[in-house]
Design a protein with these regions (language model features):
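Immediate post-signal-peptide N-terminus of mature secreted/exported proteins
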Residues: 27-100, 104, 221
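Extended amphipathic alpha-helical interaction segments
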Residues: 101-184, 191, 212-219
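C-terminal motif of bacterial Sec signal peptides marking the signal peptidase cleavage site
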Residues: 22-25
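Hydrophobic helical h-region of N-terminal Sec-dependent signal peptides
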Residues: 15-20
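Extracytoplasmic/luminal low-complexity segments enriched in Pro/Gly and acidic/polar residues
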Residues: 190-223
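Amphipathic alpha-helical coiled-coil segments
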Residues: 42-56, 95, 99-102, 106, ...
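Bacterial N-terminal signal peptides that target proteins for export
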Residues: 3-14
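Extended, heptad-repeat alpha-helical coiled-coil/oligomerization scaffolds
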Residues: 47, 51-54, 61, 90, ...
Length: 223
């Protein structure tokens, strides 16, 4: 089985480049206070997301190691192939579960961010309002990138499941296996592209939020 087998790409889906701020200082107008509260809640609501990212990364590393072990074997080790493939399938199912939990965290964050946008619309100071709109624009792009990334990751998971089921087929041909690996690799390539965009927009949002807080007269320091 190992001769001529294509390697499957590993993937680390977009790590959230989180920046949490502690605010001290003057109290702004009510819309600013409301906006600040919502933005801080957004960060809190994404803490489970960050934990799920770590779990997914660990599962991905383990699953990739299992895959590498499988392709080193030949059909004389069929029972071992089945055992490792089943273990990999269990791992994929766990990733699917944790992806759903990650999605839930982002959905809650996005819902809270809508509250922040409503508060921003009521800010009277045009300069500060413009800063808030810039932050909101980057956050929207960030959520869009995550949505695309998550959707593609779900497809990749389905392709992984099919791959490990194929590996248990005694009549599996090298050509058929390579085709499935190529499909999975193509899917993960799209995941990585959206992951990169997600990270870029996260960094831009964090900078825009800092600029917003500065303009609003808050004193900011990283926690």
């Amino acid at each position: 089985m190992k001769d001529g087998i294509k390697r499957r790409h590993g993937v680390k889906i977009g790590a959230f480049c989180a920046v949490t701020f502690l605010l001290t200082g003057c109290v702004g107008q009510d819309p600013l206070d409301s906006l600040h509260d919502s933005l801080e809640k957004v960060a809190d609501l994404e803490k489970p997301f960050q934990e799920e990212q770590k779990t997914l990364e660990e599962l991905e590393k383990k699953e990739h190691a299992l895959y590498n072990d499988v392709i080193k074997l030949n059909m004389d080790d069929y029972k071992k192939i089945v055992s490792l493939s089943d273990e990999a399938l269990e791992n994929v199912n766990k990733r699917e579960k944790h992806l759903k939990l990650e999605n839930e965290s982002i959905e809650k964050s996005e819902s809270e961010f809508e509250e922040a946008k409503t508060s921003a619309e009521n800010i009277k100071d045009k300069h500060i309002k413009a800063k808030a709109e810039t932050a909101a624009d980057h956050m929207k792009k960030r959520y869009d990138a995550y949505s695309s990334m998550s959707e593609e990751y779900e497809k990749a998971i389905k392709l992984d499941k099919k791959l490990y089921k194929l590996l248990k087929d005694k009549d599996l041909t090298l050509d058929k296996l390579d085709q499935q690996i190529e499909k999975a690799n193509a899917s993960y390539k799209k995941v990585l592209k959206q992951s990169g965009e997600f990270d870029v927009q996260t960094e831009k949002y964090n900078k825009a939020r800092k600029d917003l807080y500065d303009a609003a007269g808050y004193h900011i320091k990283k926690s």
